[in-house]
Amino acid sequence: HQPICDVLAMHAAELVFKYVYRAYRKPDDEEAREKMCEASLIAGLAFTLPKTTSSHACSFPLTNIYHIPHGEACGLTLDYFIRINAKGEGGECVEEFARRIGFKDAEEMADAVLELKKKMGLRCDLKDLELDDDQIAELVRISRHPNLYNNPVEITDEMLDEMYRYLAGK
């Protein structure tokens, strides 16, 4: 845990929640695009020391096997992992993060992430892939990327299986 990284992450998240939909709706809005560039840079600095975690680890098989763009694949599981991390050991940090960037709690922040994905036409599930049990098992296995071990809450294979089944509509 790095306090300076927390401050950077909070600033980046505030910018994203304020400007991402605006930049999406109006691509010629220079201020919104500039603020999203700033958010991207600051977010990158924020995870330089603590490294990326579960959403990033799960993005690799989704991108490599199913060709879901990397950023969209990271975002696909973000609201799911916000909820898991808020309920686990150290969850008070996630709750505090959510409050500091303007949400009532982590649940409301996760709901806002999901709503943004819907409004922007981003993937919110994997139902269209019609994944079978073997494909879900493969996603679980490949998600065991080293970044998964950076997550503040231990993510088990059972948790990954449950998440992928939920996303697949099973």
Set out the residue ranges of the language-model regions.
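Amphipathic alpha-helical interaction segments
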Residues: 7-11, 15, 35-38, 57-60, ...
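C-terminal charged capping/lid subdomain of soluble metabolic enzymes
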Residues: 95, 100-170
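C-terminal catalytic subdomain
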Residues: 50-106, 114
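Alpha-helix N-cap/helix-start motif at coil-to-helix transitions, marked by capping-box chemistry
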Residues: 3-14, 72, 88, 107, ...
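Carboxylate- and glycine-rich phosphate/diphosphate-binding segment that chelates Mg2+/Mn2+
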Residues: 1-50, 152-158
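General structural signal for alpha-helix termini and helix-helix connectors
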Residues: 22-26, 42-45, 49, 64, ...
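A general alpha-helix detector
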Residues: 15, 19, 39-42, 57-61, ...
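Hydrophobic residues within well-ordered, non-membrane alpha-helices that form the packing/core
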Residues: 20, 47, 82, 117, ...
